[in-house]
Design a protein with these regions (language model features):
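Feature captures C-terminal
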Residues: 13-16, 26, 34-36, 40-44, ...
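Hard-cation-handling environments
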Residues: 292, 296-391, 419-424
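Alpha-helix initiation and N-capping motif
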Residues: 42, 86, 111-112, 207, ...
Length: 466
């Protein structure tokens, strides 16, 4: 006797997710500071993305992880010189058809007027689950608690697959930026924030996949009793529910699996900065009778340094590029002698003298603090242009005048020098605190600590006592 039995209906769905992070204005294959072509950038990344769109169709998800509003003169020009036009970063995001965007610390730093407008102009969801209206800090998971025009998460449907993306920003903003820049906002600690939003999403959305999109490094950075600057690893370990965490902020490449407290492995991937790479995840989902029974996830870092230029995109933005070149080539002064930022790391330098003198002249302060923000930049003798100033300060800085005691000044300088200068115990020791492992780190350039903390002072008369 033969009987017919129904075989379970099996369906396989293949998806690809591509992440960019810490773009810092690297939209076009041209360095507006050095005035020369460069590799990578979004114009090259878009060529790769278009190839993947041709392969995956609507099953491709494109996400960006913030820090897009500072870094190259083109974004400064858009933020402050041409503020009435649509923000250039928003225009580029919209042109490339991103599906989701997060906010980075360098997107907060330009100030309310810039980032509020940028958020409104971006057409895809801009995410910030831990960026809340100040009256709701550490409250329940509620979409109306999130800062104006931001969303805690986005929802995407790809071939029947429901995906939720939770966005978060490093909560260390108060360590760097004056409250006036983020008035009305609070930044929640990442682990507790992730826990409440994962539960909210699981209860209310019931997705097939949950991704994190975190502008926060893997680990390390600033740690206080209230928060961790680089909290991605902590979230991956302590908050079950994530399938993949796409992250950034630390300007380092990561592609690793972290085991959470339930024993499940979570892919954590970071493409680093300046669109030299993209991070991607290939996902294969297997369904039987409508039920998800298997997830296969693979992470990969893809270099786009030598990818072909998307000529159509370049042509589209060429009129804007020409206007920016006119701006950065504008003459603003003249140097009789060249200045080198490298000298600032080893002693007196014309660069630090320039900044110290300007700060004391403008502020009328008695003492100036200044740290070099570029390791090996040169401004040649001769005409100085607007673009040259970005060589000294890639990310625009604000000047603050503080009232300090002599003891506070001493402690501040000791704190700086302790990170900068090594205590030699043998002739073989380095005079400076060096670290070979950080040679490729954009913010440490071979030093043990971040060079933006290497403050020197001007205006102090020193005396020696023996």
């Amino acid at each position: 006797m033969l009987t017919a039995t129904a075989q379970p209906a099996t369906k396989t769905v293949r998806l690809k997710v591509i992440e960019t992070s810490d773009v810092h204005g690297h939209f076009f294959p041209y360095d507006f500071m050095e005035k020369k072509p460069i590799k990578g950038t979004l114009v090259r990344a878009n060529s790769y993305i278009n190839k993947q769109r041709a392969k995956y169709g609507d099953n491709l998800l494109l996400i960006d992880n913030g820090d897009i509003l500072q870094g190259q003169p083109c974004v400064y020009w858009s933020n402050y010189v041409m503020p009435e036009d649509e923000n250039l970063a928003a225009t580029v995001i919209n042109y490339m058809k991103y599906d989701a965007e997060t906010v980075g610390n360098h997107d907060i730093e330009p100030g309310h007027k810039v980032y509020d407008k940028w958020i409104r102009e971006v057409r895809c969801p801009v995410l910030g689950a831990n960026i809340v209206k100040e009256e709701y800090k550490n409250g329940e998971a509620a979409p109306d608690h999130i800062y104006t025009n931001l969303k805690p998460y986005s929802v995407h449907y790809k071939d029947g697959v429901k995906i939720c993306v939770i966005g978060m920003l490093t909560p260390a903003i108060p360590n760097w930026l004056n409250k006036s820049i983020w008035k009305g906002i609070e930044f929640e600690e990442m682990v507790s924030c992730a826990k409440k939003w994962v539960k909210y999403i699981q209860d209310n959305e019931k997705p097939d996949l949950i991704f994190g999109l975190f502008h926060s490094g893997l680990n390390g950075g600033i740690k206080t009793d209230e928060y961790e600057e680089d909290g991605t690893e902590s979230v991956a370990r302590e908050v079950p529910g994530f399938d993949i965490i796409f992250f950034g902020h630390d300007h380092q490449v990561h592609n690793e699996w972290i085991t959470n407290k339930e024993g499940k492995k979570v892919l954590c991937i970071d493409p680093s900065c300046y669109v030299k790479n993209v991070a991607e995840a290939e996902i294969e989902l297997t369904y039987k009778n409508g039920h998800l029974v298997k997830k296969d996830i693979k992470g990969k870092i893809v270099s786009v340094l030598d990818e072909e230029i998307d000529q159509q995109m370049l042509n589209h933005f060429q009129p804007t590029i020409d206007k920016i070149k006119t701006y950065v080539n504008r003459r603003i002064g003249r140097f009789e002698h060249p200045i080198y930022t490298r000298e600032s790391f080893f002693g007196n330098s014309a660069f630090t003298d320039l900044v110290h003198n300007l700060q004391m002249r403008i502020s009328k302060a008695e003492i100036s603090f200044n740290a070099p923000l570029a390791f090996n930049t040169i401004i040649k003798a001769g005409d100085v242009t607007q673009g040259d100033m970005f060589k000294l300060y890639r990310f625009e800085n604000l000047m603050f005048v503080l009232r300090m005691t002599g003891e506070e000044v001493r402690k501040h300088l000791e704190f700086s020098y302790d990170m900068w200068v090594n205590t030699m115990t043998s002739p073989d020791d380095h005079a400076l605190r060096l670290n070979d492992a950080s040679k490729d780190d954009q913010q440490r350039t071979g030093f043990q600590y971040y060079t933006f903390n290497f403050d020197s002072a001007a205006g102090i008369d020193y005396s020696s006592f023996f």
